Amino acid sequence: NTIFTNVAINNDDMTAWWEGLDKNPPENATDWKGNKVNGKEYTAAGNKLAHPNSRFTAPAQNCPCISPEFNNPQGVPISAIIFGGRRAATTPLVYQSFSWQHGTYVGSAVSSETTAAATGAVGVLRHDPMAMKPFCGYHMADYWAHWLDMGKKLGDKAPKIFNVNWFKQDENGNFMWPGFGDNMRVLDWIIKRCEGTIDAEKTPIGYLPKKGDINLKGIEDEVTSEVEDKLLAVDRDLWKKEVEEMRSEERRVGK
């Protein structure tokens, strides 16, 4: 009950295969384009059996920790909306917008270094408003206006808006945040902000965690006090450049 896309097929047992699954590509294979090839020879020659953006989807009910409210026809309250881009510098690990309007701007300013999941060259910075650029079916400025209109209708019931960046790097190009399951530590801070049980540091870009407010128990050797400072740093010079870049991008979108 799983759907795979852009993967290779092992024709002997009709199972999916992709680079990274294991180091044994099937000999009797069909690549992601539908070509029947010898997988071992094909990959040895430098070719890829699967597309770099191969995916799978499975029923949500397969998740062992799914909420009992998942299928509630009345819906559930949304407390937080979380945007995120892939940035090596500039953007801190997490920050909260000042308001819904500011949060809409934060979402519109999302940008990422391109990966295999996006068309084009890898590592090039591209604007990706709300991470919706490949999926937005109408003019992006109208999409932003829709968000602002939603805020007017929601009033004080509007969710709080946050931005995360798991990909900040140190001066040697190494990721400073461990990611994966440790991202729950940031979500824990976000939940506490929504509950109003924790304060935050007001900065020019939004509200940031106060030092020590993100639970780093168990990863102190990896995320040291110095690393924590770097993860939450707001470099004003970099952000001035970011503002100018966004002004240029908004002028482009507005044409």
Where in this protein do the model-derived segments appear?
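Conserved small/polar residues in nucleotide/adenosyl-binding loops
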Residues: 250-253
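Carbohydrate-interacting/catalytic domains
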Residues: 237, 255
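Glycine-rich, often acidic-flanked micro-motifs
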Residues: 1-227, 238
